[in-house]
Amino acid sequence: MANVTLKPLCPLLEEMVQLPNHSNSSLRYIDHVSVLLHGLASLLGLVENGLILFVVGCRMRQTVVTTWVLHLALSDLLAAASLPFFTYFLAVGHSWELGTTFCKLHSSVFFLNMFASGFLLSAISLDRCLQVVRPVWAQNHRTVAVAHRVCLMLWALAVLNTIPYFVFRDTIPRLDGRIMCYYNLLLWNPGPDRDTTCDYRQKALAVSKFLLAFMVPLAIIASSHVAVSLRLHHRGRQRTGRFVRLVAAIVVAFVLCWGPYHIFSLLEARAHSVTTLRQLASRGLPFVTSLAFFNSVVNPLLYVFTCPDMLYKLRRSLRAVLESVLVEDSDQSGGLRNRRRRASSTATPASTLLLADRIPQLRPTRLIGWMRRGSAEVPQRV
């Protein structure tokens, strides 16, 4: 059968176009399970992140910490909102039926979430580092308004990095009639040597997103953690706050969900020159892409499960759960001081009783006699 498209395609994309639709019953069963899992994940992600946004944004006192979480939840909500369309793509037999424009928008949301998540986690780690290493500076400059401005700058940077993926995203017909939504690196200005153009652009995209959205954020997070640990060790403090544990859990989930995707993206870039990697890259990318999508579903669960006595507090309200986790370090220190004051105040009656026990006990008859005699001598205890 002749090629149904006149668009110039890179070698890897040409092989993907020629892949036939599988008719194996076991593979179709896997497709059905995949559609079910993605459908449940999309519903769960929308509900979870919507609740987090509502509670943190409308029902909690606004702090720098809640500002970070608010923007992180917004990024996850955007990714979760795109999951139903990806589920529809799977349900109709891995064919994109929603047009080229929506293909570009849908894919851009995925990459926007990828960059925004990495940038926001970096900002959270740096904020924690400044609190510990430069407490006076943080006290004077660390405000909710500044945090919002930083988040807006990070969103702008994420949008800027997403533009190439929007530009090169395209719909490509397959030989079996299905439609792919993938990036066509020869869509704009292919140049005289198409193989060189494909190889250069594919490696540039894979390496740039691997560095900017994964390795650089992890380096910032790791260096910030080391700086904080050294400073706390110098002060003789090793106590870890709840929000620090929450950030650690989110970072672990970020690495587990996005790490495989970046590895396969690098394999895909390498597959342009190493043909033996092409089948592995084309088969593995859909699975690791789904895993990356699920990161937006996992994060809201971490907000709740890092809270102690989670089930008890869930009976009270989601707000109580989040307020116990998204607490500023200064608030925790203040709470600790208040608890110490209450403990000292409860110890006062005991000390008073001890002092009273040491004061000589006066019998009424002896006290009356002493007052009649007008003696200046204090009666002795008997």
Swiss-Prot record:
Residues modified as Phosphoserine: 330, 344
Sequence intervals crossing the membrane: 33-55, 67-88, 106-126, 146-167, 210-230, 247-268, 288-307
Cellular localization per UniProt: Cell membrane
GO terms for cellular component: plasma membrane
Keyword Transmembrane helix attached: yes
Entry PTM: Phosphorylated.
PROSITE patterns: G_PROTEIN_RECEP_F1_1 (PS00237), G_PROTEIN_RECEP_F1_2 (PS50262)
Disulfide bonds: 103-181
UniProt comment concerning the protein's domains: The 329-DSEL-332 motif is involved in the recycling of PTGDR2 to the cell surface after agonist-induced internalization. This motif seems to be required for GRK2 and GPRK5/GRK5 to promote agonist-induced internalization. Thr-346 is a major site for PKC-induced internalization of the receptor.
UniProt xrefs under PANTHER family: CHEMOTACTIC RECEPTOR, G-PROTEIN COUPLED RECEPTORS FAMILY 1 PROFILE DOMAIN-CONTAINING PROTEIN-RELATED
Role: Receptor for prostaglandin D2 (PGD2). Coupled to the G(i)-protein. Receptor activation may result in pertussis toxin-sensitive decreases in cAMP levels and Ca(2+) mobilization. PI3K signaling is also implicated in mediating PTGDR2 effects. PGD2 induced receptor internalization. CRTH2 internalization can be regulated by diverse kinases such as, PKC, PKA, GRK2, GPRK5/GRK5 and GRK6. Receptor activation is responsible, at least in part, in immune regulation and allergic/inflammation responses.
Protein's UniProt name: Prostaglandin D2 receptor 2
Organism: Mus musculus (Mouse)
Gene name, Swiss-Prot/TrEMBL: Ptgdr2
